[in-house]
């Protein structure tokens, strides 16, 4: 239902079972847009300094211490699938070649990649390879393993880890249409060979013991649940043994190696609570050390530097994240000293630790910041990032002098930045200036929700657009699990803006844009806050001259389907069309079915309708499947996946049947000439959740939106071609 780099917090967020692809400690990781966010510029130079004197932080203070129409009967998935493919094949063929080739003109697609010693390890074609660091951009590389040996459909490397002394390399590999991963271990020699393989691996890390033997720790995933940790050795002393089993089914486990490799952290987590154990990176056979026993509602994550633990936690008031510090040999909570705290409504996006600095990536008032803390003198420098930026893409870096990262937006590809500690300045890449900077605008506006709460929105439109009220509008929403609405670069979003569309991203309660409390105010028995926020956002957009209901469309994936489905029931007059992908729509029946793999882990977000009548009645108030009635609905296009374990197909089909019945009932009394909405269910093969974006899927969804608004889709594809020539 839910939908992460190194980095620290980004890696740990991946452990939430609803996340997709993750490459902790790899560059260019993003789970919602994995194709387009494996992009990097082929050539760039960091020469332009953005400022001379970073200002003291205003955010923080340093403290000492998924076809069928309504006229059709339900068909078999195979026929639906074929129909869905045929709908837009002609349109797709017009732009496929350019879609597939253009990104390589200025960008290259980057899969998992990691630097270790003097080598770079990465995927080239269908192989795991390595090359010398200085030859990384050439064709001079050594093949370590052919992924085709695993006989997977379109396999790719999800994550790479190299043993400390480079005797072994481990890589997690999976198929594009599956969430099941296999971890292979390759012995590095003159003739590299696969030493072992482990199925169903989620996270994994290397450490070295006192005998200089490489030890691989990994978590085993069963039915989407990670409860077991194993450790394995290779060579003459080969073994594989279970190290830890979590017995509480509502928790999951995840491994994270501190940046200095001193400790391997065993993180035991659910949506609201965590517990961390430290495994000595020098003595991995010793018993692990508990940092703090789990306390309901208390979250914490651990990094290490110079015999000190840096703990990001929500303990204490306000119940937002703050940074604490304690000696590594005295990790208990009573020894934690408050080191740094964020201003209210600030989202901690990530944290990176360097030799002399700690870098916090923050979001405040819907804008991005970087705070650099000097660990020697506790100084704080706050950098307000360019207002066009909507998302960070973290880079790993072993250079203690520089902190590199990328910034992006839904309509602007990633751009490199580097903060240089010695100079105390932020530098951006120079060279080709993206024309979108002059042809589009990004606005931050707010909507007042029913209870008076101000809800932030991010809006994009063409600079030279006239009469915005007559322009089509595409609204995006998520609002669950404390996760931010994904705002990474997507070429089709840019095409829409170039073609005159308005894009609006609504950061409603239940998401994480304004911190932990923003999530708390939109979960359990406060889910209706998110619905009220979404309604207020769309009404505010219309009242401020951004489009009108007959030109308004709404899009969401996964858990975002709850709010979209609920709004279609309560305020269908606000919308003309909706696109949903792998949507969660049958909340009540799903949460009452404890045989589903993730129900128990979802209780903290949706409640327990099986044992709590209050939760059951509350869910009934907003659950999309429970509140449909004969009325005029917007047209709906749903993309679903046959073997999706996170959002079962059964619930989506049930929703679609009920929606079709409600539309048919309304049509009986609507009078002659009434045009019912189109209800399309496109069932795709595969078992992944929110599968990799294919060009075919993109064009199908775009064509649906254009057709429903009565717009000529040919213009859109011509606009796409024009953009691709830029």
Swiss-Prot record:
Lineage: Eukaryota, Metazoa, Chordata, Craniata, Vertebrata
Gene source species: Rattus norvegicus (Rat)
The protein, known as: Prolyl endopeptidase-like
Keywords: Cytoplasm, Cytoskeleton, Golgi apparatus, Hydrolase, Nucleus, Phosphoprotein, Protease, Serine protease
Top-level class of the enzyme under EC nomenclature: hydrolase
InterPro entries noted in UniProt: AB_hydrolase_fold, Pept_S9A_N, Peptidase_S9_cat, Peptidase_S9A, Serine_Peptidase_S9A
Active site: 558 (charge relay system), 644 (charge relay system), 689 (charge relay system)
Compartments where located: Cytoplasm, Cytosol; Golgi apparatus, trans-Golgi network; Cytoplasm, Cytoskeleton; Golgi apparatus
Xref: Pfam families: Peptidase_S9 (PF00326), Peptidase_S9_N (PF02897)
Gene Ontology BP terms: Golgi to plasma membrane protein transport; proteolysis; regulation of synaptic vesicle exocytosis; retrograde transport, endosome to Golgi
Function description: Serine peptidase whose precise substrate specificity remains unclear. Does not cleave peptides after a arginine or lysine residue. Regulates trans-Golgi network morphology and sorting by regulating the membrane binding of the AP-1 complex. May play a role in the regulation of synaptic vesicle exocytosis.
